[in-house]
């Protein structure tokens, strides 16, 4: 049963990653070339919110893996329609002098939003049933597509802007990798590996909690559904991760000024993350999982900051920095797909979810090894 769950989840995740990557290239190009009275971004943002909401509602009604994978892919399309034009609108509307402040605000919003999403989701499961989280997510998607358009100044018409042709070559240009850039590829591999290490536990968290941490829930005499302790644990971990991430955001700057080489800072952070992983691996309990979330959230916050610095330092050509950084960000998707595949294979071979922790440790340590091999 465990292997079937893991394989089904891996299929859904990989499909979502592939569809998302293709959708990002297509939507970005189409949004840039949209010529209507409402502007280039507004129609896509509204449509993205609607598509995401409708597909999420349909996803909650599906029970077979093929349908779930298909609908999850369509949710990703809607999400890309919502977020890619929104990010472009930020870049176009925010003056350079305010951009650092806005970027920080967006980062804080993402951290808080992720935690809120978890809390709302688990509350919906406990108090409303299994379909309620999908309805809540659909409502949030709909609001996300409408509220920004109402709050922002009205976007000017794009009808008078020059028309530019779109070609397959132009779409594929997004996936063109930098050439003769060994250090860049090391940074890319390091990021992919650490993303895989993080994804191995977060992706399978529900299964880890229900099949490993609370596997003796009913034999211990408890009568309430296992979803109650699982949801409580996941909510507690979300809070711990948020606290750790905020702590990392405050300390990253001063530490980076004291130790100038980001390679060492990234490696130390990777080691700290493996220590966090070792806690539930050696002492599986709700307490160790919360400690893992707290320490891991702090460590990954540092890894994320210093990894970006390493990537920027490894760019082969300043003239193509924007394109190369966009390509570097594909490492997050590669890591997510790797986590799904490694996790599914590991669970299928061992028949349990405890293998995910040592597998994650190997990935994170491999990332540290690649990082330290980079030339400064």
Where are the regions that the model predicts?
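Helix-to-loop junctions at the C-terminal end of transmembrane segments
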Residues: 23-38, 247-261, 347
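A membrane-interface helix-boundary motif in multi-pass transporters
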Residues: 40, 125-139, 345-364
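Structural signature of the two symmetry-related core transmembrane helices
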Residues: 41-57, 264-278
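Hydrophobic core of transmembrane alpha-helices in multi-pass small-molecule transporters
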Residues: 55-56, 66-82, 288-302
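Intracellular juxtamembrane helix-capping segments at the cytosolic ends
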Residues: 81-94, 302-316
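Glycine-rich segments within core transmembrane alpha-helices of 12-TM secondary carriers
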Residues: 100-125, 329-340
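Juxtamembrane intracellular "pre-TM" segments in multi-pass secondary transporters
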Residues: 155-190
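A late C-terminal transmembrane helix in Major Facilitator Superfamily
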Residues: 319-349
């Amino acid at each position: 049963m465990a292997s079937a769950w893991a394989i089904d989840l891996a299929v859904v995740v990989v499909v979502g990653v592939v569809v998302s990557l293709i959708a990002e290239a297509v939507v970005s190009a189409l949004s840039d070339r949209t010529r209507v009275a409402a502007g280039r971004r507004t129609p896509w943002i509204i449509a993205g919110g609607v598509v995401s909401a409708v597909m999420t509602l349909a996803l909650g009604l599906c029970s077979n893996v093929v349908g779930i994978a298909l609908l999850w892919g369509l949710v990703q399309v809607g999400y890309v329609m919502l977020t890619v034009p929104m990010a472009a609108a930020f870049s176009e509307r925010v003056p350079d002098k305010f951009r650092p402040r806005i970027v920080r605000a967006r980062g804080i919003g993402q951290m808080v939003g992720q935690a809120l999403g978890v809390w709302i989701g688990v509350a919906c499961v406990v108090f409303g049933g299994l379909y309620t989280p999908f309805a809540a997510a659909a409502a949030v998607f709909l609001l996300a597509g409408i509220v920004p358009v109402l709050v922002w100044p009205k976007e000017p018409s794009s009808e008078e802007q020059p028309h530019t042709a779109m070609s397959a070559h132009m779409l594929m240009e997004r996936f063109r990798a930098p050439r003769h850039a060994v250090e860049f590829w090391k940074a890319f591999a390091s990021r992919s590996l650490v993303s895989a290490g993080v994804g191995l536990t977060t992706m399978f968290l529900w299964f880890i909690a229900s099949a490993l941490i609370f596997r003796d829930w009913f034999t211990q005499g408890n009568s309430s559904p296992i979803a109650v302790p699982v949801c409580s644990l996941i909510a507690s971990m979300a809070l711990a991760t948020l606290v750790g991430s905020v702590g990392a955001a405050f300390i990253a700057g001063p530490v980076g000024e004291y130790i100038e080489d980001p390679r060492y800072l990234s490696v130390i952070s990777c080691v700290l993350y493996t220590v966090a992983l070792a806690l539930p691996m050696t002492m599986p309990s709700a307490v160790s999982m919360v400690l893992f979330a707290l320490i891991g959230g702090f460590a990954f916050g540092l890894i994320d900051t210093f990894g970006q610095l390493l990537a920027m330092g490894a760019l082969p050509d300043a003239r193509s920095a924007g394109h190369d950084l966009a390509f570097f960000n594909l490492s997050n998707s590669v890591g997510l797909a790797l986590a799904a595949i490694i996790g599914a294979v590991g669970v299928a071979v061992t028949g349990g979810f405890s293998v995910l922790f040592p597998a994650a440790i190997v990935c994170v340590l491999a990332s540290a090894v690649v990082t330290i091999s980079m030339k400064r």
